[in-house]
Design a protein with these regions (language model features):
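Charge-rich, low-complexity N-terminal segments
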Residues: 1-2
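A cross-family detector of function-defining hotspots
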Residues: 15
Length: 213
């Protein structure tokens, strides 16, 4: 384990464990692989394990999207013994899965983005399409993410990020992990890993990949 902590007034515990895998993009932009473990002390949630990446320069987290998998997390019931090897197998934590994920990030880092494409990207990520007709756009969030992309973000000026689809994705992950308005840092982290923030980051990855499809 590399680090651990508590959320929701110590009702939820989390821990990050390094898998030993890492990847490097141009500009010495390093990303490491982790397993994010979380459990509720009061039994309100099952123990979950997620295959997660952390970008070193900014500490942004992103669930590793696995091809052919419907979920980024594995749940372990409270009355079941925790089997680390089984969880790793279920998560698909293999060299090939990580290599595939890093290949996608590399592809994003090579895709140059025009100003209009950047604006359209943030519009799609921050527009609520749950209702019928035209969705509602979170203008404040969009403006902040755009400023992170345009140079304010940590690592925004690295060769891998500046003016690229990977830079767009990193602007979203930094916004959700570090900048989004929340009652407390705990609330922001809980959302970024397990709640609406995590869903926004997944949508951001999907939209970024659509630029290189």
């Amino acid at each position: 384990l590399e680090r651990a902590g508590v959320l929701k007034g110590a009702r939820k515990m989390w821990a990050l464990a390094r898998t030993g895998q890492s990847g490097m993009l141009k500009g010495n932009d390093q990303t490491n692989a982790y397993v994010l473990l979380a459990t509720a002390c009061d039994g309100t949630m099952a123990t979950t394990a997620q295959f997660t990446s952390i970008r070193v320069v900014c500490n942004n987290t992103l669930a590793v999207a696995l091809k052919g998998s419907t979920a980024n997390a594995v749940k372990v019931k409270h009355n079941t013994a925790f089997d680390a090897e089984l969880v790793k197998k279920q998560l698909g934590i293999s060299v090939s899965a990580w290599d595939d994920f890093m290949y996608r990030l590399k592809t994003l880092s090579q895709r140059k983005v025009k100003t209009t494409e950047a604006r359209n990207y943030f519009l799609k990520v921050f527009t609520d399409d749950s209702g019928a007709g035209v969705g509602k756009t979170n203008e404040r969030s969009m403006a902040k993410a755009l400023s992170l992309y345009e140079g304010e973000g940590m690592g925004a000026n690295l060769a891998s990020s500046e003016g690229t689809a990977y830079g767009l994705l990193n602007a979203i992950t930094e916004f959700i992990d570090h900048q989004r308005r929340a009652k407390t840092v705990d609330h922001r982290l809980d959302s970024a890993w397990f709640g609406t923030g995590a869903a926004v980051k997944n949508r951001a990855l999907e939209q970024a990949m659509s630029l290189v499809a």
